[in-house]
């Protein structure tokens, strides 16, 4: 009996998180019309998600995962996510589903309501420091939840930039008043990070432009990495070239950069 692991477009985690499910699960990844259009998302956002999903599917396939992938070009693209999922469930006679927690509450309810008749392994998301139960426990411990107090608690609980007495490194919990500087006119900015556009992005640019023509933006100006290799290189570039002055200028917006 086959099982299905549902992977959503914002759950493209390192394949190591999926490894223990590789041998007995099919991995279902679906480009979904409703998720692209429930708001008039900028074309760049749609292109980013779709191209990244395709690159992620390639990554899984190279590691011998068995992937069911539903493309925007397919005739049933505008059918609901649930309908497309259940076509595969019925076709493969699937009785068990695995997936990570869904952060979109409306979509989560829709999915869980429809999966009630199947065995469901609902897994803690690796996307966050805390579990859902951690946060519920915190809410039960305080009379009024404040972001600043929760932030301090996280720093202490996870030993992030605190000393042996759980006091903040640097003497303050927040340096917000020091990170709102404008970029000086004569500052030397690092050269922009460059990377090669993937074939998926090239193909999808025209498709997104046509199918979502009423959405804002132009795909020709898309500039974002869409696969793990380029994104990790971009992070290395940021740590090497930009982090030194990031704190001072993190709120600055400037056409030079």
What are these regions (language model features)?
Residues 1-72:
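N-terminal beta-strand-loop-alpha-helix module at the start
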Residues 10, 32, 72-74, 102-104, ...:
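An acidic- and aromatic-residue-enriched active-site/binding cleft used to recognize and process polar
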Residues 13-15, 35-38, 76-77, 105-107, ...:
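Flexible loop/turn segments at secondary-structure boundaries
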Residues 37-43, 68-71, 216-224, 251-257:
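Glycine- and acidic
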Residues 40-44, 98, 102, 222-233:
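Generic amphipathic alpha-helical segments used as scaffolds and interaction surfaces in large
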Residues 58-66, 90-95, 227, 243:
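Short, solvent-exposed loop/edge-beta patches enriched in aromatic
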Residues 78-224:
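Beta-rich, aromatic/charged-enriched effector core domains that present basic-aromatic interfaces
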Residues 230-257:
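Gly/Thr-rich phosphate-binding loop signature of adenosyl cofactor/nucleotide-binding cores
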């Amino acid at each position: 009996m086959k099982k299905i692991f549902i992977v959503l477009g914002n759950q493209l985690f390192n394949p190591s998180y999926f490894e223990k499910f590789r041998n007995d699960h099919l991995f279902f990844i679906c480009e979904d019309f409703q998720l692209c259009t429930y708001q008039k998302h900028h074309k760049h956002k749609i292109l980013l998600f779709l191209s990244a999903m395709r690159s992620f599917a390639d990554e899984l396939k190279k590691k011998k995962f068995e992937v069911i992938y539903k493309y925007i070009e397919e005739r049933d693209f505008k059918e609901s996510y649930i309908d497309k999922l259940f076509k595969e469930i019925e076709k493969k006679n699937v009785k068990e589903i695995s997936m990570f927690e869904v952060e979109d509450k409306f979509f989560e309810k829709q999915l869980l309501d429809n999966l009630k008749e199947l065995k469901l392994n609902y897994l803690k998301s690796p996307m966050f420091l805390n579990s859902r139960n951690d946060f519920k426990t915190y809410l039960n411990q305080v009379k009024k939840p404040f972001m600043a107090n929760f932030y301090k608690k996280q720093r202490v609980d996870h030993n992030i930039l605190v000393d042996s007495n759980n006091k903040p490194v640097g003497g303050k919990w927040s340096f917000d008043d020091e990170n709102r500087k404008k970029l000086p006119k004569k500052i030397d900015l690092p050269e922009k990070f460059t990377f090669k556009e993937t074939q998926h992005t090239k193909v999808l640019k025209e498709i997104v432009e046509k199918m979502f023509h009423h959405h804002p933006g132009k795909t020709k100006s898309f500039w974002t990495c869409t696969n793990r290799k380029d994104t990790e290189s971009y992070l290395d570039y940021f740590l090497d070239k930009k982090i030194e002055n990031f704190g001072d200028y993190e709120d600055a917006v400037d056409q030079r950069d």
